[in-house]
């Protein structure tokens, strides 16, 4: 795996929030990790809005996300990319995969699949259903896909046994995360993906899609999720409090500690820009805990 140097300006990272709610502390930890990993090597940091699911989108969330990032000093490079404006690109790839026989129409309902624990049993694989009103699934090989995560270490998954053929376009016509994220990362030239460990088990599916479409494989760094006492991650569905501009400095320092970084108590009096300037020069991804969760109660 290529190593990163302090002058690796070829680095392109990204943060890709979903506008289904406001940013919260867990979002901040993910954004900060990806921002620091890019800026520490003089790389670029892109912002992409993963707005492919309009029914889940919260009014005003897009603007609120942009404003919050700016107020916390997490400035991005270039224009914001909106996945809702990329449907033609997604459609072209779905058509190609379907026409090549690499994907097929699936009419299975959620109720039919409930007892299979998320592993698709292949009911429609050879049924030859028409595409209209059906989901589109990608055929997966009976192979193990593995990669070395920069924090979590070696990870592997047998796609056939542990996932099964997976959806790339839903029956309502909306495009699946797995397809959109792979196409957009390749289109934007992303070299490094820093995100939460809840997406660790998604990565082998993305590696397969990258291989199928002839894309380069980026480096991956999956950070521990901040979880509540009941084990659920901080998130919009659990009404985690939104980030407030007036708390930017203490929350940035807390996020740094969640990432295993040293913080100077004197920085409590600093501006967000000053905190980030120091953190950028002291960024040590190897200090991030090799675990998938960190209880919020453990953070100072």
From Swiss-Prot:
- Residues involved in Zn(2+) binding: 106, 108, 120, 124
Q: Where does L-glutamate bind?
A: 14-18, 50, 177, 195
Cite the binding residues for ATP.
236
Q: Which SUPFAM superfamilies match?
A: Nucleotidylyl transferase
Q: Does the keyword Ligase apply?
A: yes
Superkingdom of this protein's organism: Bacteria
| Keyword vocabulary terms for this entry | Aminoacyl-tRNA synthetase, ATP-binding, Ligase, Metal-binding, Nucleotide-binding, Zinc
Where in this protein would one find the motif 'KMSKS' region, according to its record? 233-237
Record GO biological process: glutamyl-tRNA aminoacylation; tRNA modification
Name under which the protein is recorded: Glutamyl-Q tRNA(Asp) synthetase
Q: Which organism is it from?
A: Pseudomonas putida (strain ATCC 700007 / DSM 6899 / JCM 31910 / BCRC 17059 / LMG 24140 / F1)
């Amino acid at each position: 795996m290529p190593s990163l140097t302090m002058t690796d300006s070829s680095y392109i990272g990204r943060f890709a929030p979903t506008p289904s709610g406001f940013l919260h502390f867990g979002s901040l930890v993910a954004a900060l990790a990806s921002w620091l990993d890019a800026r520490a090597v003089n790389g670029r940091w892109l912002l992409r809005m993963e707005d492919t699911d309009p029914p889940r989108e919260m009014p005003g969330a897009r603007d609120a996300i942009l404003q919050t990032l700016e107020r916390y000093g997490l400035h991005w490079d270039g224009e914001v990319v909106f996945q809702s404006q990329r449907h033609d690109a997604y459609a072209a790839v779905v058509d190609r995969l379907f026409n090549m026989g690499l994907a097929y129409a699936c009419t299975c309902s959620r109720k039919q699949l409930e007892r299979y624990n998320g592993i698709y049993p292949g009911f429609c694989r050879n049924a030859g259903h028409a595409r209209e009103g059906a989901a589109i699934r990608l055929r997966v090989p009976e192979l193990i896909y593995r990669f070395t995560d920069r924090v979590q270490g070696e990870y592997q998954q047998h796609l056939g046994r542990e996932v099964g053929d997976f959806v790339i376009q839903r029956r309502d016509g909306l495009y699946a995360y797995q397809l959109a994220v792979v196409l957009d990362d390749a289109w934007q030239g992303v070299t490094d993906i820093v995100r939460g460990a809840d997406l660790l088990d998604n990565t082998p599916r993305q590696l397969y899609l990258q291989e199928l479409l002839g894309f380069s494989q980026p480096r991956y760094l999956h950070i521990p999720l901040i979880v509540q006492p009941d084990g659920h991650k901080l998130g919009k569905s659990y009404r985690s409090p939104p980030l407030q501009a007036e708390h930017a400095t203490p929350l940035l320092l807390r996020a740094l500690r969640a990432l295993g970084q040293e913080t100077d108590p004197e920085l409590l009096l600093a501006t967000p820009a000053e905190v980030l300037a120091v953190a950028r020069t002291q960024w040590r991804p190897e200090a991030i805990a090799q675990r998938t969760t960190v209880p919020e109660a453990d953070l100072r």
